Amino acid sequence: MSVHIGAKEHEIADKILLPGDPLRAKYIAETFLEGATCYNQVRGMLGFTGTYKGHRISVQGTGMGVPSISIYVTELMQSYNVQTLIRVGTCGAIQKDVKVRDVILAMTSSTDSQMNRMTFGGIDYAPTANFDLLKTAYEIGKEKGLQLKVGSVFTADMFYNENAQFEKLARYGVLAVEMETTALYTLAAKFGRKALSVLTVSDHILTGEETTAEERQTTFNEMIEVALETAIRQ
């Protein structure tokens, strides 16, 4: 048991999916996993373990933002020895050729969070996905006939930011904005683990197109299937 996760050590698999929304964790467990049991309800941040195609998999909500996901992934790696962590979340597109409901594989993540500068004493550390996970996810997407987007995302500290520089980020090739990937990749590197963010575009910052809260909670199955298939091939 850790501070924020009330599970016994053996109750969490070494491969885990990480949605921000705990209700999406519940949806994934009920829809995709066999024999799923809930191992965590601390602070309402639900966690489940079950099997997918015979492979033991866990799914844990992380909450929103760098501080929240940092707590959960640190405890998962430090207290439960989780080896493979795949974020399944949403993002806002900032490129014209990226459409709502497209699936993005985050190869790298830049950020305006001070987390890494504090960690590295002012150095601009560049967090990246694990190549094996990225390659596997891309190949699975192609097998499924998906038009996956692969590239850089931006991890924002503020959801409502009056000074956001989305146009500049877009000029530099950033595909979308979200709030957790930089922390996930940095901490996975620290602990020597594998990490990847598989993201569904829930809204388009340039056009204003968006999905509903219900859609964000209970759909986006293509992203989830890619993540699960990637996890069990490790």
From Swiss-Prot:
GO molecular function annotations of the record: purine-nucleoside phosphorylase activity
- One Gene Ontology CC term in the entry: cytosol
Q: Which GO terms describe its biological process?
A: purine nucleoside catabolic process
List membrane-spanning regions: none
What residues does the record give for site: Important for catalytic activity? 216
- Provide the reaction this enzyme catalyses: a purine D-ribonucleoside + phosphate = a purine nucleobase + alpha-D-ribose 1-phosphate; a purine 2'-deoxy-D-ribonucleoside + phosphate = a purine nucleobase + 2-deoxy-alpha-D-ribose 1-phosphate
What Pfam families does this protein's entry cite? PNP_UDP_1 (PF01048)
Q: Which UniProt keywords apply?
A: Glycosyltransferase, Transferase
User: InterPro entries recorded for this chain?
Assistant: DeoD-type, Nucleoside_phosphorylase_CS, Nucleoside_phosphorylase_d, Nucleoside_phosphorylase_sf
Q: Where is the active site?
A: 203
* Record flagged with keyword Glycosyltransferase: yes
Q: Where does a purine D-ribonucleoside bind?
A: 4, 162, 178-180, 202-203
Task: Summarize where phosphate binds, as residue positions.
Answer: 20, 24, 43, 87-90
Query: EC number(s) of the enzyme?
Result: 2.4.2.1
Per UniProt, subunit arrangement is: Homohexamer; trimer of homodimers.
PANTHER family recorded? FI09636P-RELATED (PTHR43691:SF11), URIDINE PHOSPHORYLASE (PTHR43691)
Q: What does this protein do?
A: Catalyzes the reversible phosphorolytic breakdown of the N-glycosidic bond in the beta-(deoxy)ribonucleoside molecules, with the formation of the corresponding free purine bases and pentose-1-phosphate.
Member of which family?
A: Belongs to the PNP/UDP phosphorylase family.
Q: What is this protein called?
A: Purine nucleoside phosphorylase DeoD-type
What is the species of this protein?
Anoxybacillus flavithermus (strain DSM 21510 / WK1)
